[in-house]
Amino acid sequence: MQELKAYVVEDNATIRENLIGALEELTCVRVVGNSATEDEGLQWLEQNSQDWDMVIVDLFLQRGSGIRLVQRVRRGNASQKIIVFSNYVNASVRKRCAQLGVDAVFDKSTEIDFLVDYCARHCSQVTQEAGT
């Protein structure tokens, strides 16, 4: 199965480490970097625009905003996915994220399994498209 490279922007160290562990254990996702702030995340994503397949972003960060990061991040190619993973998900947040081009939104408190499933499906899709 083809490996997908992810970057995680999450300010809670426990959640970040648990998320990384789950993704790397249960899917083909390999986390290539992470940060706790908007500026650090945006800097890495800009400097490595071709080196990630998905970015997973919390909306509320130590410094900065996940929404602003999503507004400012530029995809290096159309297949890159932007995923929001936050405790503050409701209909208006989902609508705003969709307007900003976010590919998927998951609630941390109830939808981590859905996030893992989404990543696993994306792994399978990319592998099938690559013909491996």
Report residues per predicted region.
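Two-component/phosphorelay signaling modules centered on CheY-like receiver
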Residues: 13-33
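Conserved acidic carboxylate
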Residues: 10
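Active-site residues of response regulator receiver
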Residues: 58-59
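The feature encodes the CheY-like receiver
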Residues: 62
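Alpha4 helix (beta4-alpha4-beta5 surface) of REC/receiver domains from two-component response regulators
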Residues: 68, 89-106, 110
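Acidic, metal-coordinating helix/loop segments flanking the phosphotransfer/catalytic sites
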Residues: 34-54
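Short amphipathic alpha-helix used as the core "switch/output" element in two-component signaling
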Residues: 67-78
